[in-house]
């Protein structure tokens, strides 16, 4: 059940920064995808963690900044859609390199390995899915679609 999987990841990772508000909405109480739950858990954990880190970096310039992460999971007859939107730094650091964001060893983090999103992309592809990084005005949006 992906709803439970995402909620479990939110509960685990929100301890990294309890000041960030994480909202989760789903159009169903139970969404089943024929998948490797452990691998998908890694995807959701990594993406939520990246959002938290982006918000924390933005807070360095504004101590009163209120971080928000909105996560949506919707199921339809043909696909399952996972969307995460945050009001962190966004993809500004990747301007001109957005296509490289999924390449192994590509990173803008001081202590990053550049493997996180490459692994996320492989797991999503292995599950018949696609991932898109969408720059928005005040943050970042990531859209994942799994075809059933």
Protein language model regions, located:
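Conserved glycine-rich
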Residues: 129-130
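Conserved micro-motifs of the catalytic ATP-binding
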Residues: 32-35, 108
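A conserved beta-strand-to-alpha-helix junction within the catalytic ATP-binding
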Residues: 1-10
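Short alpha-helical Gxxx[C/S/T] motif in the catalytic ATP-binding
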Residues: 116, 120
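Short conserved segment of the HATPase_c
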Residues: 91-104
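Detector for a conserved hydrophobic position within an alpha-helical segment of the HATPase_c
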Residues: 124-125
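ATP-lid-like helix-loop hinge signature
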Residues: 52-77
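Conserved catalytic submotifs in the C-terminal HATPase_c
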Residues: 19-31
């Amino acid at each position: 059940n992906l709803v439970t999987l995402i909620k479990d990841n939110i509960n685990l990772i929100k301890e990294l920064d309890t000041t960030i508000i994480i909202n989760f909405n789903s159009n169903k109480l139970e969404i089943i995808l024929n998948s490797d739950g452990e691998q998908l858990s890694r995807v959701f954990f990594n993406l939520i963690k990246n959002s938290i880190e982006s918000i924390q970096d933005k807070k360095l310039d504004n101590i009163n900044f209120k971080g928000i992460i909105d996560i949506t999971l919707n199921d339809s007859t043909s696909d399952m859609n996972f969307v995460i939107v945050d009001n962190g730094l966004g993809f500004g650091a990747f301007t001109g390199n957005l296509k490289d964001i999924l390449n192994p060893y590509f990173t803008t983090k001081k202590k990053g390995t550049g493997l996180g999103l490459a692994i996320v992309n492989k797991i999503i592809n292995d599950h018949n899915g696609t991932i898109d990084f969408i720059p928005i005005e005040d943050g970042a949006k990531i859209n994942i679609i799994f075809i059933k």
